[in-house]
């Protein structure tokens, strides 16, 4: 395991919880400019060299989202003509999206499909006040609603975040947050959630799972955020069922969702981490990754949402164990990105800071930023396959740095537990 991460070179926070923490905003802005300049140098929106798909995960839509975020932050809005760049990158992504329009699954595939492209385009069109383009973007995005309601079990799975229904829900929630009027109705959101619950129940029953709701992706019962249980449960908790008190979820749905969260919670090990997949427990294979996609850095979002809804201290205690483990083992050699890199792990501390207002977590978040320019990290870190992309590369790192400038509003892309 030690090969996967660098030893943390920083002392932990030594001040009291009310000790003010001074942020070096100019250093953060300079680092943002370093990464954005590299993106503009190496990524050209009208070229297919960098990406042939255009999606949010590693394509032009992800870079467009980064520029949209730069424009959304008062402190970074004037660093670049961000909306112009966002429009250029999303335009190319939509050209690529046209090739896949006839595939129904593409219409609700968010991080790795057409739905994410049109969602980001809608936000950009809104910012540019392009009403006709916004209308077209929303129509294309909402074409995923009927497709996502088709009940199906495939050998690949269709409920997770990257390409499935949970990811589509995350896009619906995000659009409803960033657009001035709610565009996706509660009825549509609830019907998708109901189908996800039904799917999880049926799979669990068919496979004698110990968890009331269980899902698979390519035959593996993943537990992490990218393909697995914890992010699916998070998106169910974000639904209208849990938006107000008293909770409006039907009793059976509430029972199965809560029991599934508590089942997942019990899988946390003494270090504070979680298994990659349920099969690891059955086989005795001890594979523990410290990534957003697999492990505690992605699990924190469902735990935080559960804490906010159910007010049970066990969820906060679990979150603190996650954060302490990430502080020890989260300086990954896999690069600076948010899926399986330093910035994604740094987001754990921004989440805990928003949740607790404790300065130790903001301090830790800043130390993860400092690691990006650490000599050992620059020497030993690997270069991702898509080094400038949103999830694997520095476009996601830029989003993390922007959030360091406004930590009270920080959120991992499309996973805001406070919305």
Swiss-Prot record:
One of its GO terms (biological process) is carbohydrate metabolic process. CDD domains: euk_LANCL. GO terms for cellular component: plasma membrane. SUPFAM superfamilies: LanC-like. InterPro entries: 6hp_glycosidase-like_sf (IPR012341), LANC-like (IPR007822), LanC-like_prot_euk (IPR020464). It comes from the Eukaryota. Belongs to the LanC-like protein family. This is LanC-like protein 3 homolog. It comes from Drosophila melanogaster (Fruit fly). The lineage of its organism: Eukaryota, Metazoa, Ecdysozoa, Arthropoda, Hexapoda.
